[in-house]
Amino acid sequence: MILKSFILGNLVSLCMKIINSVVVVGLYYGFLTTFSIGPSYLFLLRAWLMEEGTEKKVSATTGFITGQLMMFISIYYAPLHLALGRPYTITVLALPYLLFHFFWTNPKHFFYYGSTTRNSMRNLSIQCVFLNNLIFQLFNHFILPSSMLVRLVNISMFRCNNKMLFVTSSFVGWLIGHILFMKSVGLILVWIQQNNSIISKKYIRSNKYLVSELRNSIAPIFSIILFITWVYYLGRIPSPIPLKETSKTSETAETEESEEETDVEIETTSETKGTKQEQEGSTEEDTSPSLFSEEKEDPDKIDETEEIRIDKKEKYLFGFEKPLGIILFDYKRWNRPFRYIKNDKFDNAVRKEMSQYFFYTCQSDGKDRIVFTYPPSVATFFELIEKKISLFSTEKLFYDEFDNPWKSLNEQKKRILNKIVITRILLLDKGSPTLVGDVLQKRTQLCICNDETKKEYLPKIYDPFLSGPYRRRINLLLGFSMLNETSRKNDSENIWTNKIHAIIRNNNNGFFDGVTIPYKANASDQNSIDLTEISKKVPRWSYKLIKEIEQVYDITDGELVLDYQIRSRKCKRVVILSDLNKIKKISTSTPTSTPTSTPTSTSTPTSTPTSTPTSTPTSTSTSTPASIPASTSTSIPASTSTSTSTSIPASTSTSTSIPASTSTSIPASTSTSTSTSTSIPASTSTSTNEIKSKDEPKDEPMEQAIIRYAKQWDFRREIIKGSMRAQRRKMGIYQLFQGANSYLFLDRHNFFFSDFCIYIPRLMEKLDRLRIRTNTELPISNNGEEKTREDLKNEKNQESINLKEEKHIQIAELWESIRFGQLVRGSLLITQAFLRKYIILPSVIIAANLTRILLLSPPHFFEDFKNWKKEIYVKCTYNAIPLAENEFPQNWLTDGIQIKILFPFRLQSWHRSKKIEKKDFCFLTVFGTETEQPFGSAENPFLFFKSDLIELREFIKKKKQQLKKWRTKYFRIFLRLRKKVFRKINIAKEKWVIKPILFIKKRIREFWQRNPILLLQLKEIYKLTEAKKENNSIISNGMIQSSSGSIDSIILSLRERKMKELTDRINTMLKIIEKMKKDRQKELLNTKINISPNKMSYYDKIFESQKNILKILKKRNVRFIRKSYKFLKFFVQNIYIDIFQGIINMSRINGQDSKITKSFFNNEANQERIDKPNQSIIISTIKKLLSNITNKNVKNQNLKMFWDVSYLSQAYLFYKLSQTKIINLSKLRPVFQYHGTSRFLKNEIQDYFVEVVGAHEILHSDLKQKKQKNLENSGMINPWKNWLRGHYNFDLYPIRWSKLLSQKWRNRVKQDRKNKDFNQCDSYEKKGLIDYKKQNPFETHYSLPTKKKKKYIYDSLSYKSINYEDNKDSYIYELPVQVKNNQESCYKYNKDKCKFFDILTDLPIDKYLVKNNYLVKANIRDLEKTMDRKYFDWRMLHFSIKNKGDIRVWRHNESDTNSKKNTQNGVKNFELIQKINKKIIKKIKKKELFYLTINQDKKSNPSNNKKQIFFDWMRMSEKKISRYRSNSNPKWFFPKFLILYNAYKIKPWMIPIKSLLFDLNENEIFSKKKLIEKKNGNKAKKESVAKEGVDSVLSNHTKNLQKDSAGADVKKGIKKKQSKKKIEGKLGVLRTGHFRFQLNWPNPEISKSLFMNLNGFSFMLRRLDLKKLSLAAIRNNEFSLEFLLPPSDDITFHELLEKGIFIIEPVRLSLKNDGKFIMSQTIGISLVQKNKYQLNQRYQEKGYPYKRSFAESIAIHQKRTENRTSNHYDLLVPENILSPRGRREFRILICFNSGNKNDIHRNTAFDDGNKVKTDDQVLDKRSKHLDRYQNQLKNLKLFLWPNYRLEDLACMNRYWFDTNNSSRFSMLRIHMYPQLKIR
């Protein structure tokens, strides 16, 4: 026995060793890999089933094995697994491959080359089969994802010591498993093919073709399965399209991605465990489970870009923004599905993903440090690559080469610190006592107290300004940060408190009122803390996020929010109580108090968590209407420690209160409102807003509302807009009302067995009861049976109640799911109420009482109508809360309505019945019936007649009983009398007919004896008759026996008579049949005779005609079907053409009318607008200029205009502010209520905010009383405008911005943005000056540098934006270098004169015909004052159309020129013809037409004529040049594009007026004295000057023309023919050089003749020989007299346009939208409004100012303030002792709370509130020497910069502070403490 047991024990141990051995475990896991079945097996099965030939089957098998082998290898080789398991393989490889294969398998013989045996491997189809099976194995993770398998394999492999043995054994197991699988599949397929014929013969005999159809349908089945697989994959891939981001974070999305990550790690043992285990377990920890496995919360890793910075230039490795490994194996995919949730404490969105840390060495400041870096998989991949690279690299890398950048950076920092120290020492040497506090550099701390007297700061551990990011250890046992002093004393009691209670104890309001100092644990407590957490929470958005429900229902704590950010469930706010009278305060109750409202209302105390643990628990008792059951769940947000008890006054008598089992949560809320959310039974959850607070006056109404949620699944789950929702498992919807369930978790849901689990126990109980009843042996007490019966009844009642509630919910949800369902239901309810009240019920009363009258019962008209009047219809809310009788609920059409019937009508007879209870109320249904609850089941509609029917039934029962008695009594008597009477009648009849019957009988016998043949024929009939006779005889014999003997003879005679009648009938029938046979035979004979080969019968003709009709109809149907598509297409095209033509004409007419009326017929308004002294501020100008565009686009709502110009630049800020429709006035409060000088640049801005924005309440009383002053000396000067004016390429119209996408603009701006003010790369304190060098002032427009560095642009922009007080136009300083200040090129208009109108070449060229007069008026007075306008603005056009009308004419002339360098063809000449003196006016009145012409021919225009005005747009600083005259005349071919041809070949969008109107080489001709003489001169001087101007405009060529025309009058001896030829020659030759116009006419035939008229009209302007020229033109048919209007003063120019004589159409640009061009026109809007702009034209000195000595930098500061009376530069801003970089950082920190004037530029260490003077006080003392508007600029800077430049700070955060991971400083963390002060 011992031996046997020993042997058995050894065997068991041996078996266990074998099972646990590496080989067996490897075989097991290798065998398991066979069962990771996916769609890749489809190709193998398809090849075995469908492919013919062994080659394809073998190729499919080999491809399958090869692919599986690669997948097996990928389990153990991490880089291969990452390459195959990354998401890009799905998007880039899998989906296109599947789709291509799906379309490839559909067409037949796609790659069919024919059967070739020799070159079978060259056949492409075989290779495709191999590749299909090979590639598709890589997408194998489908049904059984390999993630779990891979983890199991990894665990087992790392547990084994001999890993190679494990790998080889698993490979053997894999091979065995696949061989077995393939063999089994092959055997199954062979068996199916062999037994296919037997199965088809046995079971498919009826359909012979079914087998062939199945064989042919295999290919489509596979393709369908493949397509389904593709669709399944399509829903699982990451979208490569970038997500839509919110408007606030769109600019900084790229920079924030790498910085805003939430890092959470829970460490249980130690932090610094070895990294080798993590490297070895990299495939286990970080490997994505599978390619198509379900997406889980992948570990969040840090993938920040490692940037190599050399000399502050950013360079990336190998030219990529990210390392190559991260690009290839990006675990975040294109858009990582991060789901942002709302953080309750900070009230901002914070990512809370669990992250997997990986520690790796990285160099920082030249030292190796352990940091959080790449995922383990990528790190191992880099290690493998480094090993491979090291094998091929021969040279060794020196580590000193990599240390050079770090060394240079450290040295640079050292130099900066040395300079800072030097500046501090120099300031100390000055000996000023006020500078002592400024010399010391202090660190900014966060103050936690709002009181100015207190000084409480956060500890250094928790202060982000001192300790960097929020990264520390947090104890998880208790919420120590919120415990007060009383709770700290009871540490022994509360130290082991449950975590849930600790979470509830936290008061979330503390993070908004002030952050309290966290609790410091004792030494004894620290021993018990063994679980720590490292956290770093960085909010995503810097502003408070609100939910959709908060925005819709104004639950935003009084803040004005434009749009919500967090999505909420679909809900409806229903007002349940709106009492206009005064309502008592909400009663508070303690746990001992019990409300005494009604017997049905109960109050159960519910403990409410409060902010202090010492407060006593309170209770909440809320009485609600009876329609809300007691099982409601409430959440009562309250900011106080007392609970609310709200009573709702309603007409209902029952009310329920919230039970103790309700779950109550108290989120943070303000003291102004408290909300209670209550859920209606199992369907909706409601929340009640009690808008009644202590601060509100008592007279205001109290309103209570409930927010009702639909019982539907919510897939959004409070997802923030702009963030991609989490990829979750696909949810199938197979029911109308269903939750979010996944198909992969079907085993969790017992669909089939759930019913069995419910009903089987019940069946077992019933069986037990039956058995108990039948089995008498087992005694059972009666009490137990009674209890079980009562329990069963209660269960059944509860089940029925639950079923009814579910039905009600489904009905309610069904109405909500229908579109406009509540609207339809509400209208139906109202109509049904009206029909019921006034039609149905009166008719029912009348009908019921009439029936009572008919039934001989008394009517009840009076009582019924009395009850009818008692019935009342009350409108209720959706939740059945009644309102007033004539009051409808708010938004009842959308939210829903209920109609409650009080005292429903019943007939009077019903009230007598005792069984039926009387109902006080019910609800009306859509069908007009009654129901007990809203959405309840309808009751019987015949309830009105129920009592009458009962009475009728009783009456009928009584009458039936009476009838039965009467029938039994009298019916017997009736039968007896009937028998007696009939007997007497029969006897009399027999006696009266005896004799004739006997006689007839004899005659019949004789007849039969004479005709025996007939007797034989009717033999059978005789037999029948005899049988009947016998029967009759038997009956008659019986009768005869009973009768007397005298009656026997009579009965015999009657029998014979009956027999005779039968025979007669038979005979007649036989005759009729024979006759019918004969007639039929005759008809057949007639038809045979009439048949002939040439003739057809009538029936045949009918049949043939029907056939022909069918054929014709069939042909016509086919033809109609064939032509119907073209017919419909043609029909629809015609309809669309008609519609679009009408729309285009309408829009064209509307556009023309609006443009004409606004531009030309508002003379007085335009004149007043121009004469008014510079009233166009930025806001009003933009509003006016964009009015035409907005008015035209109101109708076309589908037109999307990109008016958000925030993408332009950081400097384009004020324009965006002026465009905002809703301005948060709370941010403007410190600006409006400022006690010092006004913070507004102009009074118009203040008036604009008062009138338009509505800032009456915010404005200070002193500001309201200020009057509007003259704006001659004030201007809209802003530092960023000065910078923009130097960048003419940003001058852009906003209409052009709509055609430019933001992304394209960003790409273009990075490349093309040029800074004109900077010719040298300076450091920080610089001002770009244009070099003068004794050259023309506008040459620098074309001599600017073309490329600027990104760093330099950021530097200049930030420095100009922050430190613009260094500029000359600022409120304190002048320019750094005073150079050439004598020349001013300002935008100064003469206020008493009209503005010079500006014209842009991309706008319509207007020509107007006013009677016979052509007049163009323009004002060139004060021309030199408006010389430097940057462009021609068409929206400033002004035309004074008076009696004769004004015309603006464009004339484009091409003259002979000689080409030079840098010149282009196509000169554009702009001629302005104006009214100058009275002589010209007299000529106009005499109807003499004039036209000023300018020819640029060198011969007629000598160069020594200095008074000539020469126009050259493109080469402003060069000499006059002649241009080549083109022989071609493009106006005859394309007159509409003539101006585009001449004017837009080159784009001179920014040409000053000076360069247009003067030759720059001869610009000394016209001096300022000649142009300003009008102010001090008289009319004679004015006329002479004007005449000289006109003479200078008129060229010599014009004089020659006048001489020629005059000579024609003098020469009388010349013949008429010669004069005609000369005149015609002049018309032909001179017309091409002096006539250019553009005109469109609606009728093309009329336009030709009108074109001829205008040719002659334009030529005859200012001609002396006008009559001869006109006669010659008429003779040559060049004039059409039909279009000449008679001279009359009645016709006006407006009437001409209205009658359609001229249709002026704008010419659209056929010009490509250039980014610079568009930007230049947009910012040009603000440039026009500038009144003062001084341009210093000298290059700045080269080099960095602060790299030189400190004395030089001080000298620069002295230069800046040399024009001031005193130099107190260092007193103004205390932080100026720092370096520029440190100063910028310090200013950014200060400006975040600059709205409070007491906190601006305040020192932290020496600040006691009294000693140190603020900047405002210093500036008030120096206000005597400063201009007012410069102080206003300072205030505007303090307003604009902190409030609207946060996003710009975030953009430049990295550059300013040299931070990659935001460890030193981050702008985005400051909003974590929104109400804290920075001191």
From Swiss-Prot:
Keywords: Chloroplast, Membrane, Plastid, Plastid inner membrane, Protein transport, Transmembrane, Transmembrane helix, Transport. InterPro entries: TIC214. Residues 245-305, 586-702 are annotated as: Disordered. Changing residue 1451 to K: In strain: cv. Baekmibaekdadagi. Pfam families: Ycf1. Changing residue 1384 to K: In strain: cv. Baekmibaekdadagi. It is found in: Plastid, Chloroplast inner membrane. The chain crosses the membrane at residues 18-38, 64-84, 87-107, 124-144, 172-192, 218-238. GO terms for biological process: protein transport. It comes from the Eukaryota. Changing residue 1435 to K: In strain: cv. Baekmibaekdadagi. Signal peptide: none annotated. It is a multi-pass membrane protein. Involved in protein precursor import into chloroplasts. May be part of an intermediate translocation complex acting as a protein-conducting channel at the inner envelope. Part of the Tic complex. This is Protein TIC 214. It comes from Cucumis sativus.
